[in-house]
Every structure is written in C-alpha cells, then in structure tokens.
Amino acid sequence: MQTPLESTDVKLDTLNEPSAHLIEKNVALPKDIFRSYLSYWIYEIARYTPVMILSLVIGVLVLLIIFFNDNEACVFNSAYYAYLSLVVLLIILGDGNPKLVSRRNFRTELLVDVITRKPAVEGKEWRIITYNMNQYLFNHGQWHTPYYFYSDEDCYRYFLRLVEGVTPKKQTATSIGNSPVTAKPEDAIESASPSSRLNYRNFLLKAAEIERQAQENYWRRRHPNIDALLKKTE
C-alpha cells in the first residue's frame, strides 16, 4: 500500500527529472503474477459477484430448459430470462465497470502519485504507480481484487485518457524541453494529506505538464537532433 505523501516533496515547480529515490523495487503486477491475460481474466471474473450470480442464473435456466423441454411455457420463460441474463453479463464483461475507477478521489490519488514520482515515458516509475492504484482501489472497496490494472501500460493508458485535452500552463517560447517548467508560488501544493482540500483542476494541470515534459524528454533521447530539425522547419 502506498506510503503517505511527503508534502514538502510535491511542488509544482519540480518537473526536471524523475524522483529516483521514490522508485520502489520488486513490485509485482498482475502481468507478473499470472501466466497469461486469460488466466488473469478468469481469476477476476471468478471473484466478481455480479458475474458469478448471473452465470449461476443462466446455468439454472439452461438446466430448466433441458429437463423440462416438454413444457413450452417453462422453456419459453427460461429461454427469455436466460437471454436477458446473458445480455447483462456480456455488458458487464465488456464494460469493465469503469464507474469504479471514475471517482474523483481515485483520479486525484493517481494524479498526486504522478506529480510525486514524475514518471518518464515507459519508465519503471509506472510500475509502482500501478501497484499503488491497484491497492488503493482494493483497500477502498472500489474493486474486488488488488489487480484492477493488469500492467503498467494499462494504468498509463488510463492516465493519458485522464489528461487528454488538458492544456498545461503556458510557457515562454523555448526549444523542446530545454528549460524546466516553473509555476507561480500560489500554485504550489501546500499539502497532499487526506484532510486537505484538494484542488483537482490544479493537480490535473500539473500532471499534464509532467506528461508533456516526459514526452519531450522521451523524444529528445530518441532523436538527439530534434532541435536542429525543428529550427529547419521554422
């Protein structure tokens, strides 16, 4: 489970480098625990009460159809309710119950963890963030197992959807990633304790800044001459 955040380390003007001292080792995610995604999926389904109940109902209705096939009314009613149950079951399986991970407190927890750790693109920081989010959902009763996100890639994709369309704070014109992003003192996150009044929009903007900086650093590492290429296009 995630340790309490150190409020003094969470500042809006610290976007430069990932916080290496916050990266924890030996964190096992579902993709490390299960042999395949199928085995993980079966494990999750077997422990999801609504799915188990619907599966049991469908099984009972199918047995009624088999053993009372000479009773047209029984067969018709059983087939009708089995069909409805199957439709609901497929909706649940396809939906993935996103409402459980759309609550503001969970999104805030994810944003604060990203702000604290400043993960790089494809960085190992995402492993501990994913582990923390899985534990958070389970410990707070928002998911039935501590394995909601199968991998760090899944958690990262969820984060990207969260900050999609969010415009980070405007900066002065510079070449890509040459200078750290600074913010006004009043934007600093004074405290990240559960009792504090969290400014969700502030966290969202800050996390979007960090992701933008991480993307720029990623592409600069892959293409060291990117500044020269950009100057040619000006």
Swiss-Prot record:
Q: Give positions of region: COPI binding.
A: 231-234
Residue numbers bearing the Phosphothreonine modification = T3
Can you say where in the cell this protein is located? Endoplasmic reticulum; Golgi apparatus; Cytoplasmic vesicle, COPI-coated vesicle membrane; Cytoplasmic vesicle, COPII-coated vesicle membrane
Please tell me what else the database record remarks about this protein: Members of the DUP240 multigene family are specific to S.cerevisiae sensu strictu. Cells lacking all 10 DUP240 proteins show no obvious alterations in mating, sporulation and cell growth.
What residue intervals traverse the membrane? 48-68, 73-93
Q: What is this protein called?
A: Multicopy suppressor of SEC21 protein 27
The gene behind this protein is: MST27
One cellular component term (GO) for this entry is: ER to Golgi transport vesicle membrane
Q: What species was this sequence derived from?
A: Saccharomyces cerevisiae (strain ATCC 204508 / S288c) (Baker's yeast)
Q: Which UniProt keywords apply?
A: Cytoplasmic vesicle, Endoplasmic reticulum, ER-Golgi transport, Golgi apparatus, Membrane, Phosphoprotein, Protein transport, Transmembrane, Transmembrane helix, Transport
